[in-house]
Amino acid sequence: MKTIKLACSLDANQTYIIAVSGGVDSMALLHCLVAQKIKLQVVHFNHLARPNVWKDKELVQSYCLQNSLCFHYFELNCPQKNFQAQARLLRQQKLMQIATKHQTPFILTAHHLDDLAETILQKITRSSTLLGYSGMQIQTSWQDFIFLKPFLYVPKAKIISYAAFYQIPFLEDYTNQNFTYQRNQIRHQVIPYLKTQTSFLQNIPKYQQTLLQAYNFIRKQTLLFLTKHTNHSCNPPNSFALAPFLNLDLVIQKDIILLLLEQQNITKSFIFIQNIIKGINNPYKPNLSWHLNFEWHLIKDYKHITLMSPAPPLSFALSKPLLCVSTCNLCLACISPSLQSLNYNPQKVSFPLKVRLRQPKDTLKFSFGTKKLKKFLIEKKVPLTQRNNLWLVVDNLDNILFIPHLYINLTLGNQSKIYLAFKNFFTSSNCFSQTN
C-alpha cells in the first residue's frame, strides 16, 4: 500500500473544509483524507478563465458523489489585472464562508514541496521579510480560521506517483504552462534545473525551518519589548520610548516596525522599512513623520515613536480654553487648581489678555534678550506634533506673557500681580518643565 506522510496530523472528530481544483495535487489529498475517514466539506472554484472548465467541476462533483462528500461550487469573476492575487483573495473568502457555515475553523489546501520552493524563489526575486522568505507555513491563522497544508513537505513527483498507484482521476490545467506568470517560469525552467544539479528540493524544508526559527526568536523579542514599553503610563497611546528602542539590534527594530504595520494591515516595501529605521536612528533629525496610509502616520519625536491618525484641522482638533484673570487667587481656585501668578508693571502690559495658538514669527523675551519661540521649543525638545497645539497667553499688543508648563515672561516688572487660570484647558503633555 502506498501512503503519504502528512505534515500535520488531522483529527477525525473535526470537520475540515478542503479546496479541490480537480488537479492531481488536490485530488490526491482528497483521496488520502477520505482513506483516513476525515470529515470533509469539498469546495471547488471555477475562475471562468479557460474553456472546458465544466469538466473540472464534473470530475470533482462525481468523486464527491461516489464518496458521499458534500460538494460546494463557486464561480469567481476576477479582473484580469493582478488576476492570481485577486483570485486567491476570493477563494479565501469563500472558504471562510463555508467554514463558518459548518462551524469549523479548519481549511485545507493541497500546496506541496514544489509549491513551497516556487514561493521561496519568487519571494527572493521580489524581496520580502524574514517570514516571507520562508515561503508558506504548514499552519497559519487568519481571523478565526486555521489554514493547513498537509502536503507541504511532499514532493510533486511523489504525489503523481501516489495518484498513479491508486488510479485517482484528475485533470491538468493548461494555464499552468502559461509563461506570462513568473511562477510558471520558475516551475518549468528554474526548479527542474536546480533539481538535476543539486539536492535543492530536499533542502527546502531545512531552509524554511531555519528561517522560521530565526523569525520566531526575533518576533518573541519584539513582543517582549512592546509588552514592556508600549502604552506605559509615561508614554502617549500607541507609542513607546525612543531611547530603549535605539538600544535594540537593528533586526529587532525592523521587526517592531513590521509588527506595528501588520497590526493595521499595512503592507510596505523593504526599502520603505529601511528608510524608517534609518530615520529613527538619525540623531540629527529628532522629529520625523512617515505617511503609512490614509488612516495612520508613524511619528518620531525626541522621546517617543508613535503610531497615530493624521491630525484633523486645528479648528476641529482643539477647543480654545477660557482664560480667567484676577488679582485674587482665591477667586480662581474654583476654576482651576493650577494657577499662574504674573508680576508686571502696568505700562508694560496692554490689556485685555487673550489666548491664541503659536504663530511662525513668535518671539519670547528674557532678561538676556529675545529668542524665537521656534528655537526655544527645539531647545526644550517639544515634539513637533505638539508645537502647533500650544496655547499662548498674550496681551493686546501680542506680547507673549505665558505658555503653560513652558514659559513665563519675567521681564514685565513687579509693581502689580495678577493670577491666570484656564477653564477647559487641554494640553497633550504635562511633562514640560517651565522656564523662568
UniProtKB/Swiss-Prot annotation:
Entry similarity comment: Belongs to the tRNA(Ile)-lysidine synthase family.
Lineage: Bacteria, Bacillati, Mycoplasmatota, Mollicutes, Acholeplasmatales
SMART domains, per the entry: TilS_C
Protein EC: 6.3.4.19
Name the record gives this protein: tRNA(Ile)-lysidine synthase
Organism name: Onion yellows phytoplasma (strain OY-M)
Chief location of this protein within or outside the cell: cytoplasm
Any single GO BP term: tRNA modification
Role of this protein: Ligates lysine onto the cytidine present at position 34 of the AUA codon-specific tRNA(Ile) that contains the anticodon CAU, in an ATP-dependent manner. Cytidine is converted to lysidine, thus changing the amino acid specificity of the tRNA from methionine to isoleucine.
Keyword Nucleotide-binding included in the entry's annotation: yes
Keywords: ATP-binding, Cytoplasm, Ligase, Nucleotide-binding, tRNA processing
Subcellular compartments: Cytoplasm
Entry remark concerning the domains of this protein: The N-terminal region contains the highly conserved SGGXDS motif, predicted to be a P-loop motif involved in ATP binding.
